[in-house]
UniProtKB/Swiss-Prot annotation:
Name of this protein: Ribosomal lysine N-methyltransferase 5
Annotated gene: RKM5
The enzyme's E.C. designation: 2.1.1.-
Family, per entry: Belongs to the class I-like SAM-binding methyltransferase superfamily. RKM5 family.
Domain of life: Eukaryota
One GO CC term, this protein: cytosol
Disordered: annotated span: 55-74
Length: 367
């Protein structure tokens, strides 16, 4: 069964937060009671993503069919591909008072991101994000539901002619979202503060082989389509050969405190953002575990507000935001929702799904 959306408002915020943290308390014996670092023991993490669980047998059959030369019944429910990434992180930088202006949480991999990838690709309930379909919306227990049409976030079939983009905010150093989700979109822009970017680029380059479905071009990573050796008298380029589609992948600095897209003169400072507008018909902004204290909430929401206005008015893009929160402070979660809904006038939906509710995470769809 697909996830449902609970439309939150200034009254139901508190009901939602109370219920979610009550659920969390009831599962305290099953869930790790830590801050959410994926693994603090090592500088290099080896992580595998693969189909698993109750549908394992069915997925394995799909994998075997994919390897045949005949027509492929690509997944309509869950992804069939597996991925293995090697992530270099810096525990010492996390605890440093000198690195990146004392903003150091991005130097390690936090567990929200791997959980989100597994849920998005392999959970049957996340199918609307893979298929692009209507999702039931409720406004609380006393409200009849209606449906919200969602564009595809990830096209697993490769048959959809729509152009999709992902803009990642607060990416951190791991680079695992672009090298995995980049397989299913046309443009991916990964952003964070300037001090994070070199390690982010290193991890992306280390795991570039996981872009199994795409050829990757990137100005920031200095990646170009290779030229194939001449055959006879003809010069043939890789772009002219029937092969994988192309992913535009960029890494860029984006400071939430300084961004000002209302000033047209500053647009030239963000060519990567313009790339999304110029190449895509829909964009999902993805932000995983970026709301962990109250001081980040206003800069983050102001940035979303500017991005939404600019991308919709300039390029007429379909604009959606997915925010993943590791449920730590109930006060911070409540304040984030209050500000997003009441002060910044966003439409915010709680993604209601059993797999998520059995975790320490929550995901919100913002439009």
């Amino acid at each position: 069964m697909a996830f449902k959306l609970w439309l939150l408002d200034e009254e139901t915020i508190y009901e939602h937060v109370f219920e979610r943290y009550t659920q969390l308390e009831g599962q305290s014996g099953k869930l790790a009671q830590d801050l959410g670092i994926q693994d603090r023991r090592g500088g290099v993490l080896e992580i595998t993503f693969e189909p698993s669980g109750l549908e394992g047998g069915r997925k394995k059959k799909r994998v075997r069919r994919r390897n045949k030369a005949s027509s492929v019944e690509e997944d309509q429910n869950v992804a069939v591909d597996s991925y293995h990434v090697s992530v270099g992180q810096s525990i010492s930088s996390l605890h440093s008072s000198r690195d990146n202006g004392n903003s150091t949480t991005g130097y390690v991999l936090w567990s929200t991101t791997p959980f989100f990838i597994n849920w998005l690709l392999y959970s049957t309930s996340a199918a609307p994000f893979r298929l692009g379909s209507q999702v039931e919306v409720t406004c609380g227990s006393s409200c009849e539901g209606h449906x919200l049409e969602l564009p595809r976030l990830x096209d697993l079939t490769g048959a959809d002619r729509g152009k999709r983009g992902i803009l990642e905010l607060g990416a951190g150093i791991s680079g695992i979202l672009p090298v995995i989700l980049g397989n299913f979109v046309d443009t991916y822009v990964s952003t964070d503060q300037k001090g994070i970017l070199n390690k982010l680029k290193d991890n992306i380059m280390e795991n570039l082989s996981q872009l199994t479905r795409k050829r990757c071009i990137s100005r920031s990573l200095r990646l170009e389509l290779p030229t194939v050796e001449p055959v006879g008298d003809a010069d043939i380029t890789a772009a002219s050969l029937p092969s994988k589609s192309t992913l535009h992948l960029e890494v860029a600095a984006l400071d939430w405190e300084k961004i000002n897209l209302q000033d047209k003169k500053t647009h030239s400072l963000h060519p990567e953002l313009s790339l999304i507008g110029e190449t895509c018909s829909s964009v999902y902004v993805i932000a995983m575990d970026v709301i962990y204290n109250e001081y980040l909430i206003d800069p983050f929401l102001k940035t979303l507000k500017q991005l939404k206005h600019w991308l919709q008015t300039t390029y007429n893009l379909q604009f959606h935001v997915l925010v993943g929160i590791h449920l730590r402070s109930q006060e911070v979660t409540t304040l984030f929702l209050e500000k997003a809904i009441i002060e910044y006038d966003f439409t915010v939906y709680d993604i209601v799904d059993q797999v998520i509710q059995e975790s320490r995470f929550n995901f919100y769809l913002i439009t």
